[in-house]
Amino acid sequence: MVKFEESVKNKEISGVLGQDYVKKQLKSAILMRRHVVLVGPPGIGKTTLVRSLVNLLPEVDVSGEMVKPPFVRVQGSPDLTSEDLIGDIDPSKAIKYGPMSPSAFTPGKIFKADKGILFFDEINRCSEKLQNTLLQVLEEKKATIGSYEIDFDANFILIGTMNPEESSTEPLSDVFLDRFDMIYMKPPESLAIEKEIILSKNINLVKFPDKLLSNTIGFIRKLRNSSDLEKHPSVRATIGIYERAQSNAYLDSKDVVDVKHVQDAIISVLSHRIRLKPSLKYVKTTTEFLREEFNQGFNDDLADNGDSP
């Protein structure tokens, strides 16, 4: 049987290019079975990265059989209830076994994640009641269910994600956050890595010239650093323009993307993915801002100056 520590150390986190520092931090936390919240803007691969973490873990013994450890996802939402996480009484089983019998209990997602990973996406949308529900489980790796006198095992690693730009339904309490390590994830480190991410999508409807693609990515990265914006475009925006520019060229019966095809995609792809600062949004619209930035800044220098995240 492969030891837990050896498995985590020797296996690679796949599916996300770059982010070497974040990957090492995640491995370090998982090695000690610590709970983690991965913090970063949308569209940078947080979910993909978390999904790949279960591959670090060795097989686990379930009823005498060696199987892959479970990976259970919970989507943060104001509608999420304690019963979704912990479980509830099944009426039909309660009739058969009695309402106080553990056999009448249908386990929730935290028990399904036992010996594996519980992925809590958008954990900053977790209500105070749910935070309190999780406190015992995170600390003791067990949960006491209602009036039952039995503690149920819930030995999982919780990996949460959150977007710092979005408000939570209720602030995460200091007591709750004290159960986690925080790891901060940023957009791709360089233009070259971002280009590699884009090309890995294998979308080749028409030819996208390499220099034009570099300039397109450089333009997005320039917006990502803009002091005029309080919400910046993610890698999803880059992928969107890459795809839509090809579509525009194809609809024009062209075999090669040109600048006009990129320009025609800018407003549709970017206008809702950025937000102007209050000092600017009363002076110009988002559409006007994007057109000005494109006309003034889309040039050959972008490919050389796009290495800041």
Which residues does each predicted region cover?
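Conserved Walker
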Residues: 16-18, 37-42, 61-66, 97-110, ...
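C-terminal engagement/docking regions of AAA+ P-loop ATPases
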Residues: 42-43, 48-51, 251-309
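A short helix-turn-beta junction within AAA+ P-loop NTPase domains corresponding to the substrate/partner-engaging
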Residues: 171-187
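Short glycine-rich substrate-engagement loop in P-loop NTPases that contacts/grips substrate
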Residues: 79-113
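Pre-Walker A (pre-P-loop) alpha-helix and adjacent loop at the N terminus of AAA/AAA+ ATPase modules
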Residues: 4-44
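Walker A/P-loop
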Residues: 27-77
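AAA+ ATPase "lid" subdomain C-terminal helix
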Residues: 32, 221-229, 239-257, 268-276
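Structural recognition of the conserved hydrophobic beta-strand(s) that form the central parallel beta-sheet
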Residues: 119-120, 156-163, 245
